[in-house]
Curated annotation (Swiss-Prot):
Negatively regulates transcription of bacterial ribonucleotide reductase nrd genes and operons by binding to NrdR-boxes. Transmembrane segments: none annotated. Its cofactor is Zn(2+). It comes from Thermus thermophilus (strain ATCC 27634 / DSM 579 / HB8). This is Transcriptional repressor NrdR. Residues 49-136 form the ATP-cone domain. The gene is nrdR.
Length: 153
């Protein structure tokens, strides 16, 4: 590694140890030319999860955007913000590939809300599925009601 003080092209590692709870390696280096020491950190750089939008554009996954949608759906509902926050901020860990469609994110969020709170589920579904009539709302509510009856048996 190049010395930041004199620009010498090669330095030697004097000490190396784990840092940041094992997420980085801290190295003390010494320049053979000027004798100065400096510290470097080596970290893994993860590629961000990319979201493929409906129009084909790609953008990095933003857990805050998902959280905003969940909070809106759960407004004035007996749902802990911490539960929603945990879902949004661990979402990337549950995705196996480098890309996910916005549709898949919506479906995973719907499945999560369906287990958590049916009213929040309907609110989220109405925006996500773009309900364009009262009949669509009623259809979705009936499907939830029949699900509740099956679980109650």
């Amino acid at each position: 590694m190049k010395c930041p003080y004199c620009g010498h092209p090669d330095t030697r590692v004097v000490d190396s140890r784990p840092s940041d709870e094992g997420m980085a390696i801290r190295r003390r280096r010494e320049c053979p030319s000027c004798g100065r020491r400096f510290t470097t950190y080596e970290r893994t750089q993860l590629e961000p999860l990319m979201v493929v939008k409906r129009d084909g554009r790609k953008e990095p996954f933003n857990p805050d955007k998902l959280l905003r949608g969940l909070l809106l759906a759960c407004e004035k509902r007996p749902v802990s913000e911490e539960v929603l926050r945990r879902f949004a901020y661990t979402f990337e860990d549950q995705v196996s590939g480098p890309e996910i469609t916005s549709e898949e994110i919506g479906l995973k969020a719907l499945a999560f809300l369906k287990e958590l709170d049916h009213v929040a589920y309907i609110r989220f579904a109405s925006v996500y599925r773009e309900f364009d009539s009262v009949e669509r709302f009623i259809e979705e509510i009936r499907s939830l009601a029949s699900l509740d009856k099956k679980e109650g048996d």
